[in-house]
Amino acid sequence: MPSGCHSSPPSGLRGDMASLVPLSPYLSPTVLLLVSCDLGFVRADRPPSPVNVTVTHLRANSATVSWDVPEGNIVIGYSISQQRQNGPGQRVIREVNTTTRACALWGLAEDSDYTVQVRSIGLRGESPPGPRVHFRTLKGSDRLPSNSSSPGDITVEGLDGERPLQTGEVVIIVVVLLMWAAVIGLFCRQYDIIKDNDSNNNPKEKGKGPEQSPQGRPVGTRQKKSPSINTIDV
Protein backbone atom coordinates (compact mmCIF):
# COMPACT_ATOMS: atom_id res chain seq x y z
CA MET A 1 0.00 0.00 0.00
CA PRO A 2 1.42 3.43 -0.86
CA SER A 3 2.57 5.49 2.08
CA GLY A 4 0.34 8.45 1.21
CA CYS A 5 -2.85 6.41 1.28
CA HIS A 6 -4.98 5.59 4.34
CA SER A 7 -7.50 2.82 4.65
CA SER A 8 -11.10 3.83 5.43
CA PRO A 9 -13.11 2.04 8.14
CA PRO A 10 -15.84 -0.40 7.16
CA SER A 11 -19.26 0.95 6.36
CA GLY A 12 -20.87 -0.60 9.48
CA LEU A 13 -18.31 0.93 11.79
CA ARG A 14 -18.76 4.30 10.11
CA GLY A 15 -22.50 4.12 10.88
CA ASP A 16 -21.95 3.34 14.54
CA MET A 17 -19.50 6.20 14.95
CA ALA A 18 -21.88 8.55 13.20
CA SER A 19 -24.67 7.56 15.60
CA LEU A 20 -22.46 8.26 18.66
CA VAL A 21 -21.25 11.64 17.45
CA PRO A 22 -24.57 13.48 18.08
CA LEU A 23 -24.79 12.05 21.65
CA SER A 24 -21.29 13.06 22.72
CA PRO A 25 -22.13 16.75 23.40
CA TYR A 26 -25.08 15.77 25.66
CA LEU A 27 -23.53 12.87 27.57
CA SER A 28 -21.31 14.86 29.91
CA PRO A 29 -23.94 17.48 30.99
CA THR A 30 -26.50 14.72 31.65
CA VAL A 31 -24.12 12.80 33.88
CA LEU A 32 -23.16 15.97 35.72
CA LEU A 33 -26.81 16.87 36.25
CA LEU A 34 -27.62 13.45 37.71
CA VAL A 35 -24.61 13.55 39.99
CA SER A 36 -25.40 17.06 41.18
CA CYS A 37 -29.03 16.12 41.88
CA ASP A 38 -27.91 13.07 43.83
CA LEU A 39 -25.51 15.15 45.89
CA GLY A 40 -28.22 17.74 46.47
CA PHE A 41 -30.62 15.13 47.84
CA VAL A 42 -27.93 13.69 50.09
CA ARG A 43 -27.04 17.12 51.45
CA ALA A 44 -30.71 17.92 52.02
CA ASP A 45 -31.15 14.76 54.13
CA ARG A 46 -28.15 15.53 56.35
CA PRO A 47 -28.75 17.40 59.60
CA PRO A 48 -27.36 20.90 60.07
CA SER A 49 -24.17 21.55 61.97
CA PRO A 50 -24.36 21.99 65.76
CA VAL A 51 -24.46 25.53 67.12
CA ASN A 52 -23.46 27.17 70.41
CA VAL A 53 -20.54 24.79 70.94
CA THR A 54 -18.94 25.57 74.31
CA VAL A 55 -16.38 23.94 76.61
CA THR A 56 -17.00 24.07 80.37
CA HIS A 57 -15.92 22.31 83.58
CA LEU A 58 -12.25 22.68 82.72
CA ARG A 59 -9.94 20.51 84.79
CA ALA A 60 -6.31 19.49 84.50
CA ASN A 61 -7.19 16.24 82.71
CA SER A 62 -10.81 16.64 81.61
CA ALA A 63 -13.42 19.02 80.25
CA THR A 64 -17.04 19.01 79.08
CA VAL A 65 -18.16 20.08 75.62
CA SER A 66 -21.81 20.98 75.01
CA TRP A 67 -23.78 22.14 71.97
CA ASP A 68 -27.25 22.82 70.59
CA VAL A 69 -29.07 21.42 67.58
CA PRO A 70 -31.45 23.55 65.49
CA GLU A 71 -35.07 22.61 66.05
CA GLY A 72 -37.00 20.61 63.50
CA ASN A 73 -34.16 18.23 62.64
CA ILE A 74 -33.85 14.52 63.38
CA VAL A 75 -30.54 13.84 65.13
CA ILE A 76 -29.67 10.36 66.39
CA GLY A 77 -26.14 10.93 67.64
CA TYR A 78 -22.99 13.00 67.52
CA SER A 79 -19.35 12.81 66.54
CA ILE A 80 -16.62 14.84 68.27
CA SER A 81 -13.16 15.41 66.81
CA GLN A 82 -10.61 16.27 69.49
CA GLN A 83 -7.15 17.47 68.47
CA ARG A 84 -4.25 18.45 70.69
CA GLN A 85 -2.20 21.34 69.39
CA ASN A 86 1.59 21.07 69.24
CA GLY A 87 1.58 17.38 69.96
CA PRO A 88 -0.04 14.03 69.29
CA GLY A 89 -3.42 13.28 70.75
CA GLN A 90 -6.13 13.15 68.09
CA ARG A 91 -9.33 11.41 69.14
CA VAL A 92 -12.77 10.90 67.63
CA ILE A 93 -15.73 10.21 69.93
CA ARG A 94 -18.82 8.88 68.19
CA GLU A 95 -22.13 7.86 69.76
CA VAL A 96 -25.49 7.05 68.17
CA ASN A 97 -29.01 6.37 69.47
CA THR A 98 -28.76 9.20 71.96
CA THR A 99 -30.27 12.64 72.37
CA THR A 100 -27.61 14.04 74.67
CA ARG A 101 -26.18 17.47 73.96
CA ALA A 102 -22.98 17.21 76.02
CA CYS A 103 -19.99 14.92 76.35
CA ALA A 104 -17.11 14.59 78.80
CA LEU A 105 -13.57 14.68 77.43
CA TRP A 106 -11.16 12.66 79.56
CA GLY A 107 -7.49 11.70 79.50
CA LEU A 108 -6.34 15.20 78.56
CA ALA A 109 -2.86 16.51 79.21
CA GLU A 110 -2.62 19.25 81.78
CA ASP A 111 -1.80 22.80 80.73
CA SER A 112 -2.30 21.95 77.04
CA ASP A 113 -4.21 23.47 74.14
CA TYR A 114 -6.97 21.51 72.40
CA THR A 115 -9.52 22.11 69.67
CA VAL A 116 -12.83 20.29 69.24
CA GLN A 117 -15.40 20.10 66.46
CA VAL A 118 -18.83 18.53 66.76
CA ARG A 119 -20.90 16.89 64.03
CA SER A 120 -24.53 15.83 64.22
CA ILE A 121 -25.45 12.34 63.02
CA GLY A 122 -28.76 11.96 61.20
CA LEU A 123 -30.55 9.15 59.42
CA ARG A 124 -28.69 9.86 56.15
CA GLY A 125 -25.23 10.68 57.44
CA GLU A 126 -23.24 13.27 59.32
CA SER A 127 -23.55 17.02 59.20
CA PRO A 128 -20.70 19.32 58.25
CA PRO A 129 -18.38 20.02 61.19
CA GLY A 130 -19.44 22.74 63.57
CA PRO A 131 -17.28 25.70 64.54
CA ARG A 132 -13.81 24.89 65.83
CA VAL A 133 -13.54 25.64 69.55
CA HIS A 134 -10.22 26.13 71.33
CA PHE A 135 -9.65 25.54 75.04
CA ARG A 136 -6.75 25.02 77.42
CA THR A 137 -6.67 22.62 80.34
CA LEU A 138 -5.65 23.72 83.82
CA LYS A 139 -2.35 23.11 85.51
CA GLY A 140 -1.99 20.36 88.07
CA SER A 141 -1.37 22.94 90.80
CA ASP A 142 -4.66 24.71 90.04
CA ARG A 143 -6.92 23.19 92.66
CA LEU A 144 -10.63 23.63 92.84
CA PRO A 145 -12.49 24.81 95.96
CA SER A 146 -13.21 22.13 98.53
CA ASN A 147 -16.96 22.31 97.93
CA SER A 148 -16.64 21.66 94.19
CA SER A 149 -16.76 18.25 92.57
CA SER A 150 -13.66 16.29 91.72
CA PRO A 151 -12.63 15.60 88.11
CA GLY A 152 -14.11 12.13 88.34
CA ASP A 153 -17.53 13.58 89.12
CA ILE A 154 -17.99 15.12 85.68
CA THR A 155 -21.11 13.69 84.11
CA VAL A 156 -21.94 13.22 80.46
CA GLU A 157 -24.70 15.77 80.73
CA GLY A 158 -22.30 18.38 82.11
CA LEU A 159 -24.61 19.41 84.95
CA ASP A 160 -23.39 21.22 88.06
CA GLY A 161 -23.10 19.34 91.32
CA GLU A 162 -25.40 21.78 93.14
CA ARG A 163 -28.72 22.52 91.49
CA PRO A 164 -31.37 24.81 93.00
CA LEU A 165 -34.68 23.18 93.82
CA GLN A 166 -37.53 23.84 91.43
CA THR A 167 -40.88 25.22 92.59
CA GLY A 168 -42.64 21.89 92.11
CA GLU A 169 -40.05 20.06 94.17
CA VAL A 170 -40.38 22.58 97.02
CA VAL A 171 -44.19 22.21 97.01
CA ILE A 172 -43.93 18.41 97.15
CA ILE A 173 -41.48 18.55 100.07
CA VAL A 174 -43.72 20.97 102.01
CA VAL A 175 -46.82 18.81 101.43
CA VAL A 176 -45.01 15.68 102.63
CA LEU A 177 -43.79 17.46 105.78
CA LEU A 178 -47.31 18.74 106.54
CA MET A 179 -48.75 15.25 106.13
CA TRP A 180 -46.19 13.82 108.51
CA ALA A 181 -46.91 16.57 111.04
CA ALA A 182 -50.66 15.87 110.82
CA VAL A 183 -50.14 12.14 111.35
CA ILE A 184 -47.88 12.73 114.36
CA GLY A 185 -50.35 15.22 115.87
CA LEU A 186 -53.28 12.82 115.41
CA PHE A 187 -51.31 10.02 117.05
CA CYS A 188 -50.42 12.19 120.05
CA ARG A 189 -54.05 13.26 120.46
CA GLN A 190 -55.34 9.70 120.39
CA TYR A 191 -52.66 8.68 122.87
CA ASP A 192 -53.73 11.44 125.30
CA ILE A 193 -57.39 10.41 125.03
CA ILE A 194 -56.59 6.77 125.74
CA LYS A 195 -54.37 7.75 128.66
CA ASP A 196 -57.11 9.96 130.20
CA ASN A 197 -59.70 7.20 129.89
CA ASP A 198 -57.43 4.73 131.63
CA SER A 199 -56.70 7.16 134.49
CA ASN A 200 -60.45 7.86 134.99
CA ASN A 201 -61.45 4.20 135.05
CA ASN A 202 -58.85 2.98 137.55
CA PRO A 203 -60.11 4.94 140.68
CA LYS A 204 -63.72 3.82 140.11
CA GLU A 205 -62.71 0.19 139.91
CA LYS A 206 -60.64 0.45 143.11
CA GLY A 207 -63.39 2.17 145.20
CA LYS A 208 -66.17 -0.05 143.94
CA GLY A 209 -66.99 -3.03 146.23
CA PRO A 210 -69.86 -5.54 146.43
CA GLU A 211 -73.18 -3.72 146.85
CA GLN A 212 -75.10 -4.40 150.10
CA SER A 213 -78.72 -4.05 151.00
CA PRO A 214 -79.89 -1.69 153.78
CA GLN A 215 -80.09 -4.68 156.11
CA GLY A 216 -76.42 -5.47 155.48
CA ARG A 217 -77.10 -8.25 153.09
CA PRO A 218 -75.70 -8.34 149.66
CA VAL A 219 -78.08 -7.11 147.07
CA GLY A 220 -77.18 -9.84 144.76
CA THR A 221 -78.52 -12.59 147.11
CA ARG A 222 -82.22 -13.30 146.87
CA GLN A 223 -84.20 -14.00 150.09
CA LYS A 224 -85.91 -17.32 150.26
CA LYS A 225 -89.71 -16.93 150.31
CA SER A 226 -92.27 -19.54 151.43
CA PRO A 227 -94.85 -20.55 148.87
CA SER A 228 -98.31 -18.96 149.31
CA ILE A 229 -101.54 -20.91 148.74
CA ASN A 230 -104.78 -19.15 147.95
CA THR A 231 -108.03 -21.02 148.53
CA ILE A 232 -111.25 -19.91 146.87
CA ASP A 233 -114.55 -21.22 148.30
CA VAL A 234 -117.46 -21.52 145.92
From Swiss-Prot:
Q: Which GO terms describe its biological process?
A: negative regulation of inflammatory response; response to transforming growth factor beta
Which stretches does UniProt call biased (Basic and acidic residues)?
Answer: 197-209
Annotated GO CC locations: endoplasmic reticulum; extracellular space; plasma membrane
Which spans are transmembrane here? 168-188
All copies of the Fibronectin type-III domain together span 47-140
PROSITE patterns reported for this sequence: FN3
Q: Please list where the region (Disordered) is annotated.
A: 122-160, 197-234
Gene3D superfamilies referenced in this protein's UniProt entry, alphabetically? Immunoglobulins (2.60.40.10)
Which ranges sit in the Cytoplasmic compartment? 189-234
Q: From the record, what ranges are coiled-coil?
A: none
Induction summary? Up-regulated by inflammation in the intestine. Up-regulated by TGFB1 in a colorectal adenocarcinoma cell line.
Glycan attachment sites: 52, 97, 147
One Pfam family per UniProt:
fn3
State which tissues express it.
Answer: Highly expressed in the liver and the brain, including in the cortex, hypothalamus and hippocampus. Also expressed in adipose tissue.
Extracellular face residues:
45-167
- Taxonomically, the superkingdom here is Eukaryota
Q: Which UniProt keywords apply?
A: Glycoprotein, Membrane, Secreted, Signal, Transmembrane, Transmembrane helix
Residues in the signal sequence: 1-44
Q: Does the keyword Signal apply?
A: yes
- PANTHER family per UniProt: FIBRONECTIN TYPE III DOMAIN-CONTAINING PROTEIN (PTHR14470), FIBRONECTIN TYPE III DOMAIN-CONTAINING PROTEIN 4 (PTHR14470:SF2)
Q: What is this protein called?
A: Fibronectin type III domain-containing protein 4
**Source organism of the structure:** Homo sapiens
Gene for this protein? FNDC4
